[in-house]
């Protein structure tokens, strides 16, 4: 494969979920220096739920998005800074502030069937001159054909790259292959595509490899898999696999391995791994960032987190409905007569 893969690190955004958005300034700078030294192409920085995600509903961050972005901008020289914006949480005002703080890439994220709400934010990002990405979350919840229709909308608004986003870590390799083929069939040849995997079924790396085989240009991954649920595709593992496949990725594997084990893993207050609870996310097709919220609710109401997560899956809850976790817990408690 002659083309160079674009390596997009998400340790400092999706990884924030794993520690309830409590990265210190020193943490983000240490991680960013290592990633920059390893020559990743971009480093995504924000609260786990994107710009202005710090809230009662999603969890308050140790710092503001702008403080984190500015801290990373101070220490990187190679990588571009990316950020995430969910329309309805972040605004174009927040996007402008992030740009002024140093972000040059924005991923505008919507549920996989709601691309139409991204129009204003994508258009404004293009006006700012940002690398503008459409990010279709929970991509397993619609058909490949419907996903392609939504991707085409984002492209029409000005997005120059569209992501298949397996927020629930629920897809297998055939699911990924079908979605990339559907996107490639309708998008312009010059429009890039990306893959954002979660590891809840231990398929994060495999799904990312299949995406590349189907022509995917950008791969999201994180050091030690640091991310919501069982984490994202572990960056160092994906790079090792890409290296063995003979693919051009441009990063230093050993620097990434050291950063994963020496810097990132020690920060985890709950191991980022496939276990009973995180497996339930992938099995039930639940938004990965529901994990920590569900564990808190389970402890509070004397329930099993797995039962809450499976019920959330049955109800087809999506990102942004974190407030329903307590409702589900109370329903389960009532049904059990406890």
Curated annotation (Swiss-Prot):
Residues 5-257 form the Pyruvate carboxyltransferase domain. GO terms for biological process: catabolic process; L-leucine biosynthetic process. Keywords: Aromatic hydrocarbons catabolism, Lyase, Manganese, Metal-binding. Mn(2+) binds at residues 14, 196, 198. Gene3D superfamilies: 1.10.8.60, Aldolase class I. PROSITE patterns: PYR_CT. It catalyses: (S)-4-hydroxy-2-oxopentanoate = acetaldehyde + pyruvate. The record marks 13 as: Transition state stabilizer. CDD domains: DRE_TIM_HOA. The active site is at residue 17. It comes from the Bacteria. Its EC number is 4.1.3.39. InterPro entries: 2-IPM_HCS-like (IPR050073), 4OH_2_O-val_aldolase (IPR017629), Aldolase_TIM (IPR013785), DmpG_comm (IPR012425), DRE_TIM_HOA (IPR035685), PYR_CT (IPR000891). It is an enzyme of class 4 (lyase). HAMAP family: HOA (MF_01656). This is 4-hydroxy-2-oxovalerate aldolase 3. It comes from Paraburkholderia xenovorans (strain LB400).
């Amino acid at each position: 494969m002659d083309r160079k893969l674009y390596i997009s690190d998400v340790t400092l955004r999706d990884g924030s979920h794993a520690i309830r958005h409590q990265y210190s300034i020193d943490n983000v700078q240490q991680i960013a220096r290592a990633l920059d030294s390893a020559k990743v192409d971009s480093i995504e920085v924000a609260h786990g739920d994107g710009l202005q995600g710090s809230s009662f509903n999603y969890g308050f961050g140790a710092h503001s998005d702008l403080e984190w972005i500015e801290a990373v901008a101070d220490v990187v020289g190679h990588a571009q800074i990316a950020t995430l914006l969910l329309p309805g949480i972040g605004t174009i005002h927040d996007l402008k502030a992030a740009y002024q703080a140093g972000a040059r890439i924005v991923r505008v994220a919507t549920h996989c069937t709601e691309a139409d709400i991204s129009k204003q934010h994508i258009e404004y990002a293009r006006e700012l001159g940002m690398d503008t990405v459409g990010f279709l979350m929970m991509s397993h919840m619609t058909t490949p054909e419907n996903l392609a229709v939504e991707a085409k909308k984002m492209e029409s608004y000005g997005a120059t790259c569209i992501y298949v986003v397996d927020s629930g870590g629920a897809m297998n390799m055939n699911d990924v292959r079908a979605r990339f083929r559907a996107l490639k069939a309708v998008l312009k040849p010059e429009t890039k595509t990306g893959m954002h995997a979660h590891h809840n079924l231990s398929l994060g790396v495999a799904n990312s490899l299949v995406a590349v085989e189907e022509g995917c240009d950008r791969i999201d991954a994180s050091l030690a898999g640091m991310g919501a649920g069982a984490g994202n595709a572990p960056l160092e593992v994906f790079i090792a696999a890409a290296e063995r496949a003979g693919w051009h990725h441009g990063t230093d594997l050993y620097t990434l391995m050291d950063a994963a084990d020496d810097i990132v893993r020690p920060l985890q207050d709950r191991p980022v791994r496939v276990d009973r609870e995180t497996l339930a996310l992938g099995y039930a097709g639940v938004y990965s960032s529901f994990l920590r919220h569900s564990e808190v609710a389970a402890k509070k109401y004397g329930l099993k987190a797995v039962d809450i997560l499976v019920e959330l899956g049955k109800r087809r809850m999506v990102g942004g409905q974190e407030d329903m976790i307590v409702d589900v817990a109370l329903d389960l408690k009532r049904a059990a007569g406890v």
